[in-house]
């Protein structure tokens, strides 16, 4: 919702994230990003990581978690996983969404199973490699 207001909206979003963090709240950026590798890497750093400019590091929006769309494949998700590992952050990866038309693609049967089940298995694979004490950060 913030993005519809352009730069002032993004500034308000950053202020909202910072305010929530000042209250020790966990911030989930419901950004649903998913793109080719290099663009996903930029999104991942911008939302969850730090960017190096000269000798100084700057945080972007600095959410604790972000939502990611995996439907472009692993090269669109792996940059987020790498940043999460470096920054001790987490992801919620879309598998089956609740919007009315989600079934147009997500419910398609592939080898006897809906696509979202295949996606869920892949997300579980990614998560298995990144377990914390009790759960995966993916």
PLM regions and their residue ranges:
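Conserved anion-binding
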Residues: 35-138
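N-terminal active-site wall of soluble small-molecule enzyme domains
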Residues: 1-59
